């Protein structure tokens, strides 16, 4: 007995519809899984990026803190501002140092030096002899054998007196309106974010005995406590001031 062709066609159509429905479910599940995977991957990449920024930014802060005081006379405090979330200090970041090749009078603005190359206009400079120091600002880029100041020194210096750059640095937490907190790095007036998405930043100041101090003259170490993003585990480190 031959069955009607319409029955076979109906069965085939039902099977196709069931298969399509099953395929749609599988496709939906697969799409959901891919979306979830992409979301997790993006979160992991964001976390890795934050951690990399944290490591690099913290390394820069540590290295520059070690130089605190190298851009000042030896009897001046290495740190000029001690805050829980802000620190300001002077350092000779590029180790730019030279000496006077001739005596300089108190009214002199043009300093004869051994080498003034790569000393940029606007930088603070310090001149020191055995018993006194003075500060000035470069009126223009340094030349091979001279440095020009914006104003006279006010005191005389003998030949052989040391001249060095004093970079002014400041690290602080900035919270843009409605945005995440950033750790900012300011050098000689220009500032930029060095670590983003900061959720905790704390500075503590220690003397040579490892005791907390609020007196800049006695600070020899700085403890840094930093947390980035929503991580429970942050970074805690102590930095000794090499310049003191």
Which residues make up each language-model segment?
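Solvent-exposed loop and beta-edge segments used for protein-protein assembly and interaction
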Residues: 83, 119, 163-165, 216-218, ...
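Aliphatic-rich helix starts adjacent to a transmembrane/signal segment
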Residues: 2-66
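Short, glycine/small-hydrophobic-rich surface segments
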Residues: 43, 65-97
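Glycine-centered small-residue hotspots that permit tight backbone geometry or close packing
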Residues: 23, 69, 105-107
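Type IV pilin-like appendage domain
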Residues: 86-211
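Hydrophobic aliphatic residue packing
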Residues: 14, 18, 26, 99-100, ...
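Generic detection of short hydrophobic beta-strand segments and adjacent strand-loop junctions
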Residues: 58, 136, 237-241
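Short linear sequence signals and composition-biased patches located at protein termini or domain-edge surfaces
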Residues: 39, 48-49, 63-66, 80, ...
């Amino acid at each position: 007995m031959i069955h009607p062709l319409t029955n076979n066609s109906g069965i085939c159509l039902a099977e196709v519809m069931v298969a399509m429905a099953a395929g749609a479910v599988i496709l939906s599940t697969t799409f959901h899984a891919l979306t979830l995977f992409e979301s997790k991957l993006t979160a992991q990449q964001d976390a890795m990026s934050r951690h990399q920024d944290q490591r690099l930014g913290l390394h820069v802060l540590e290295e520059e803190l070690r130089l605190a005081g190298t851009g000042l006379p030896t009897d001046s405090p290495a740190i000029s501002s001690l805050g829980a979330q802000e620190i300001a200090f002077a350092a000779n970041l590029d180790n730019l140092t030279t000496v006077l090749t001739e005596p300089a009078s108190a009214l002199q603005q043009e300093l004869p030096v051994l080498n003034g190359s790569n000393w940029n206009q606007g930088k603070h400079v310090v001149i020191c002899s055995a018993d006194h120091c003075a500060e000035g600002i470069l009126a223009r880029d340094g030349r091979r054998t001279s440095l020009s100041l914006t104003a006279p020194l006010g005191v005389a210096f003998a030949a052989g007196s040391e001249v060095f750059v004093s970079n002014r640095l400041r690290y602080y937490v900035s919270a843009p309106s409605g945005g995440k907190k950033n750790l900012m790095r300011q050098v000689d007036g220009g500032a930029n974010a060095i670590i983003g998405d900061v959720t905790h930043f704390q500075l503590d100041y220690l003397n040579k005995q490892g005791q907390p101090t609020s007196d800049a003259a006695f600070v020899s170490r700085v403890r840094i406590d930093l947390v980035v993003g929503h991580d429970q585990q942050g970074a805690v480190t102590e930095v000794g001031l090499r310049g003191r």
